[in-house]
Amino acid sequence: MPAKIVLFLTAFIMAPWANSEPLGLPPLPVPVDNPQTPEKIALGAKLFNDRRFSTTGEIACAHCHAPEKAFTDLKTVSEGINGLTGTRNAPTVINAAYFKSQFWDGREPSLERQSTQPLLNPVEMALPNHDPVLKIARTDPDYQKAFRAVFGKSGEAVTMVEVSRAIAAFERTLIAGDSPFDRYYFGGETGALTPAQVRGFALFLNEGRCVSCHTVEQDHALFTDHRFHNIGVGINQIQDQVPGLATAFLEAKARGANVDKAVLGDKKTSELGRFAVTSLVDELGAFKTPTLRNVAVTA
């Protein structure tokens, strides 16, 4: 995509817990069973940055989703425990609160569900189970105090439900809006964009048809349709192997194979895309439309 199009999509705002969203964003969806509170957000931030939640004590969520790198790692594929690499790019956490599904193949529906998987993946944080996380959460004095204050729980009553809810609450504060584009399109500031950027936006809407997938609504723009598309990248290189790969994967899945571990552990399996979740042939090689917010620093 030409640079003149993307320049105005890059404003980054780390929003504190608040009752209003930056210009250009819809109301923040917050689960009824996990309301935002400042104390919960602070606990989630601590958990997000805790490197003890890995087999070597070196990898935290923030390792692949670094604040100074727009909550990604700026690598083609992420590097986890002992330098092991996965098969997919680390998506930014910014605005993930608005996404209707998590991971590139949408295998989890919420931030709460998503947050527990990297802990157990052999190429990410590589814990054998969640027990090491819970041991720390239940015995660390600071965590004991925080979980008691936020959830009214301590000891064995603290589970991964509380851990995941705190992490998700923190992640819901990582939002980006109020960019020059937002001020131009939603705020009516005609001078917020340069003439070149205005021409780029016209191309984005019309000849380029970028907006077909990177949608702009009347009152907000997340620049994604939340859908899954096969644009031929990756899977076309192994087209003749796809039938065998798909069949083998379905058989393994029927035997109880873990989708998260399978797609991050094998590059060819990873190329199956959304099919690995739904088993629908039409979704072979399909991946979630990425947001264009902050694309200048995350691409």
Predicted regions and their residues:
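C-terminal capping alpha-helices of c-type cytochrome domains
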Residues: 21, 130-177, 265-281, 285-296
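N-terminal signal peptide c-region/cleavage motif recognized by signal peptidases
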Residues: 13-18
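Conserved nucleotide-diphosphate donor binding/catalytic pocket of glycan-assembly enzymes
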Residues: 111-128, 143
